């Protein structure tokens, strides 16, 4: 493998494809329960909604689109939505970001979760006022009694410490004919920071003493490392070390 003026020679040997499948290892334990409603969103006393999704926005505007989905199903203003994306400690495991699945798969899951939340909050208001659920409606995050419009309460006042409920996979979704947010041309929330250079691109992010690792992979599935000659790489300016763990190989600089 060429790198600057140095050279690293790596030879691979190939075995059956099944061998590669057997080395996948165990997945780490999940930190949050995907079926818990509180995993997906929180609402504060000011009616601001924080949404947690396991996807990230790679520049395609999915943060804006997912915010629209959440605002629509919750019947809250778009600007009341705050999005936490891809934080592995606090967001649900929604697999990878890619293959056009963020909206198709991740958006569908978020839609069901927020529809569940909306139904749960309406139910709480109905119990509080001792009225039928069908008598209530939501406008901008405020539950209103249609028979007595002066009787109203915000989501933030209803939420308490949390939902403590499971996501209802059969939650009633809002009809497309009632959409007020989804389908609207809303300015993307990620653009301002990008055009003003405030956005911290990962390529420009550097901490004091931070190192870079280049992983060296075979072009063939199932290959194993037969030998490594890193004498040339060691001569490259900035070289720190070669790391080999079984068939994993990387150069740190």
Each PLM stretch: what is its role?
Residues 2-14, 19-253:
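Cofactor-binding beta-sheet edge motifs in enzyme active sites
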């Amino acid at each position: 493998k060429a790198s600057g003026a140095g050279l690293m020679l790596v030879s691979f040997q190939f075995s059956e494809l099944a061998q590669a499948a057997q080395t996948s290892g165990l997945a780490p334990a999940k930190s949050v329960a995907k079926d818990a409603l509180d995993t997906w969103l929180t609402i504060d006393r000011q009616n601001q909604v924080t949404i947690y999704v396991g996807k990230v926005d790679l520049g395609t505007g999915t943060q804006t689109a997912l915010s629209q989905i959440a605002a629509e199903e919750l019947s809250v203003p778009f600007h009341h939505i705050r999005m936490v994306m891809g934080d592995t400690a606090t967001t649900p495991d929604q697999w990878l970001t890619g293959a056009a699945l963020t909206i198709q798969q991740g958006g569908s899951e978020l839609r069901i979760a927020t529809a569940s939340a909306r139904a749960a909050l309406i139910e709480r208001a109905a119990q509080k006022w001792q009225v039928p659920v069908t008598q209530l409606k939501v406008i901008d995050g405020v539950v209103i009694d249609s028979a007595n419009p002066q009787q109203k309460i915000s989501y933030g006042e209803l939420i308490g410490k949390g939902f403590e409920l499971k996501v209802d996979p059969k939650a009633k979704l809002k009809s497309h004919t009632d959409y007020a947010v989804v389908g609207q041309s809303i300015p993307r929330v990620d653009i301002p920071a990008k055009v003003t250079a405030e956005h911290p691109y990962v390529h420009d992010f550097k901490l004091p003493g931070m190192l870079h690792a280049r992983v060296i992979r075979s072009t063939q599935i199932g290959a194993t490392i037969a030998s490594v000659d890193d004498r040339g790489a060691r001569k490259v300016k900035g070289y720190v070390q070669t790391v080999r763990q079984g068939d994993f190989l990387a150069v740190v600089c």
